[in-house]
Regions:
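C-terminal motif of bacterial Sec signal peptides marking the signal peptidase cleavage site
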Residues: 17-20
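N-terminal targeting/tethering segments
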Residues: 29-153, 157-158
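Cell-wall glycan
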Residues: 147-152, 159, 165-169, 174
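Bacterial N-terminal signal peptides that target proteins for export
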Residues: 2-8
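A C-terminal, polar beta->alpha supersecondary segment
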Residues: 24-64, 164-204
């Protein structure tokens, strides 16, 4: 997991679990996060209404910044993460740059998993993963971002955030291959090793 948000990774958008995080070295080196204590307080005390207040302007801001639907999704995620986790106020240019980098690295991550390791996730596998996990979630931050986007939780999970869950399924299948390659079962180390593979192949 990216060390910037490892302490309380679940308070970012959607799941942003290990398989959903991207290392954005360089682009975010200057960004200051809220302290671990502040993040913990958010996680432990924020209600559904608190999250809705945080997210309420995200869709309009994203629509102003980016019209392309694929990239706009990542702009929404970047804005949501900024409002929840960052002490640094991002400029429009920074938001768009971070969103573009995250989208490109996500595609590259999946491409390497497929082409180098032969790992993909089927629609059935993704649906099952979501149905057994995210669809049963009552986490207020998930409900709030879905409501902000005028979606039900199921629509949000199976539609908007489907790519994140696809990545989680791929990781489950990819991990045993990486364990053999790197001779370790340490999840964080494996994630870092694979992120290094992505970074080596990423062209800005």
């Amino acid at each position: 997991v990216n060390k910037r948000i490892k302490p309380l990774v679940l308070i970012a958008t959607a799941v942003l679990l290990m398989a959903g995080c991207e290392t954005q070295a360089g682009s975010q080196a200057h960004i200051k996060l809220k302290s671990v204590e502040e993040q913990r307080e958010i996680l432990e005390t924020y209600t559904l209404d608190d999250y809705k207040t945080i997210y309420e302007n995200v869709p309009d801001e994203a629509n102003r910044l980016e019209k392309d639907q694929d990239l706009q999704k990542w702009v929404i995620r970047t804005l949501a993460e900024e409002k929840l986790l960052y002490d640094t106020d991002l400029s429009d240019k920074q938001v768009k740059a971070l969103a573009k980098e995250a989208m490109e690295k996500d595609k590259l991550w999946k491409s390497i998993a497929k082409k180098k390791y032969g790992v993909i996730a089927s629609d059935a596998e993704i649906d099952r993963y979501i149905e057994e996990g995210a669809d049963t979630s009552g986490l207020p931050q998930h409900l709030a971002i879905a409501a902000t986007l005028n979606m039900s939780l199921e629509e949000y999970n199976h539609g908007f955030d489907r790519d994140i869950y696809e990545k989680a399924v791929i990781w489950q299948k990819l991990k045993p291959k990486l364990e053999k390659k790197y001779n370790t079962t340490n999840n964080e180390m494996l994630a870092e090793k694979f992120d290094e593979e992505v970074e080596k192949n990423y062209k800005k």
